[in-house]
Curated annotation (Swiss-Prot):
GO terms for biological process: DNA-templated transcription. DNA-dependent RNA polymerase catalyzes the transcription of DNA into RNA using the four ribonucleoside triphosphates as substrates. It is found in: Plastid, Chloroplast. It catalyses: RNA(n) + a ribonucleoside 5'-triphosphate = RNA(n+1) + diphosphate. GO terms for cellular component: chloroplast; DNA-directed RNA polymerase complex; mitochondrion. Its main location: plastid. It is an enzyme of class 2 (transferase). It comes from Euglena anabaena (Euglenaria anabaena). Belongs to the RNA polymerase alpha chain family. This is DNA-directed RNA polymerase subunit alpha. SUPFAM superfamilies: Insert subdomain of RNA polymerase alpha subunit. GO terms for molecular function: DNA-directed RNA polymerase activity; protein dimerization activity. Its EC number is 2.7.7.6.
């Protein structure tokens, strides 16, 4: 009979990070170095994450008679906005996010920003953001309005992966059937589910 037991020894959050310590126990002998390497490889390869993969910025001058939005390229510098366009895009890419609808793999959203309007108040119904302290931009004038067109995707791969640290801990007593795994991830991820699926796959391969 196969037995694979995963226990949560400790789980905590600090700022925009989640820290998890798991205990892994099995009735099958295995080399802890081999399974540790396989767990890391599998989690990095298979764990899904969510990122803003494309951002288009448009600006409107409310004083202008045209009342048209003009596209901003990465070299555009507007006096009424503290940050350059490329800085705003980099700030957007730094957001640690998760789609509210778990079944969605891709979503395009449009956000309008003004001096009075907060980015996070506009976006909270669509995605969850763990690093709410991440600055996006500062609009200094009431006459300027920015429209953001954001493409958000949920996928596998290093670019999307929410896991930042993986440590496999081998007991000093060399009890190979009883080891621990430490994971540091962004706050909104589904670490336990991904870990269980990863271990189940490795275990069934009869390491």
């Amino acid at each position: 009979m196969k037995l694979l037991k995963i226990s949560i020894l400790r789980q905590s959050t600090f700022k925009n990070k989640k820290y998890n310590l798991f205990k892994i126990k099995t009735n099958r002998d295995f080399n802890p170095l081999v399974i540790g390497t396989k767990i890391r490889r599998n989690l990095i390869k298979e764990t899904k994450g969510t990122k803003i993969t494309q951002a288009s910025l448009f600006v409107l001058n409310k004083k202008s008679k045209e009342k048209l939005y003009h596209s901003l390229n990465e070299f555009t510098n507007i006096e009424e906005i503290s940050e350059k366009t490329n800085e705003i895009i980099k700030n957007l890419e730094r957001l640690k996010i998760k789609l509210v609808n778990k079944n969605l793999k891709k979503k395009i959203i449009c956000i309008t920003l003004t001096k009075e309007n907060s980015f996070f108040k506009e976006i909270y119904k669509t995605i969850k953001i763990s690093n709410l302290n991440q600055k996006i931009c500062t609009i200094k004038s009431h006459n300027v309005e920015i429209k953001l067109l954001l493409k958000i995707e949920k996928e596998k791969g290093i670019k999307f992966n929410p896991i930042e640290t993986i440590n496999f801990i081998i007991p000093k007593k060399n009890n190979e059937n009883n080891s621990s795994l430490f994971l540091e991830t962004i706050r909104n991820d589904q670490t336990f589910t991904e870990l269980y699926q990863s271990l189940k796959l490795i275990y069934n391969q009869q390491i």
